[in-house]
From Swiss-Prot:
Polar residues bias spans: 154-172
Annotated family: Belongs to the bacilliredoxin family.
Species classification: Bacteria, Pseudomonadati, Rhodothermota, Rhodothermia, Rhodothermales
Organism: Salinibacter ruber (strain DSM 13855 / M31)
InterPro entries on file: BrxB/BrxA
Span list, region Disordered: 141-172
Lineage top rank: taxon: Bacteria
Full protein name: Bacilliredoxin SRU_0242
Length: 172
């Protein structure tokens, strides 16, 4: 059962105030991806969880302020815009396990970079933003991306690499 609209509206606005378009139906998803077919598109799967509030949404804001920016930026809200979220996952993210929050950068209709929940949990917004900026710099240009362009964050230098998020480390 979805959370009350009044509860999630502020969470939606954290992204829409940045100029990110909400996709609330499969038709909205088709229209957005159709418009970005030969361009770049950043998809954010929003969520009510703490790592969305404390990590993902602030990281997106920081990354978009830093630039470069994608041609299009869109969001669906997991658990709220259920049909749109399921459709975007099934249609545009095949083989990628569902998670939220989640971010994917698309270039020419194909996902080229993903940030899954496991790349967000226990990390500071600045670190998540740096990962996203690296992807934007590699893929949001008129030039071909470098051969070593990343496809996911490299967590090997993260303090929590390979372990539990900091909030759960005391129980390991």
């Amino acid at each position: 059962m979805p959370y009350p609209k009044s509860m999630v509206e502020p969470m939606r606005k954290e992204l829409t105030r940045l100029g990110i378009d909400e996709l609330k139906s499969p038709d909205d998803v088709d229209a957005a991806f159709g418009a970005a077919e030969d361009e770049t598109l950043l998809l954010i799967i929003n969520s009510v969880c703490g790592c969305a509030a404390g990590g993902a949404r602030p990281a997106v804001a920081q990354a978009l302020e830093t630039g470069p920016t994608p041609d299009h930026a869109v969001t669906v809200f997991a658990g709220q815009d259920v049909a749109a979220t399921d459709y975007v996952r099934d249609t545009h993210l095949p083989g990628i396990p569902p998670s939220s929050p989640f971010m994917a950068l698309f270039r020419n209709g194909q996902p080229v970079y993903v940030i899954e929940r496991k790349h967000i949990e226990g990390r500071e917004p600045a670190a998540i933003s740096a990962d996203l900026v690296e992807a934007l710099q590699a893929y949001c240009t008129d030039e071909a991306p470098p051969s070593d362009a990343p496809s996911r964050p490299d967590l090997s230098s993260s303090p929590n690499a390979g372990g539990l998020p900091s909030t759960f480390q005391s129980i390991s």
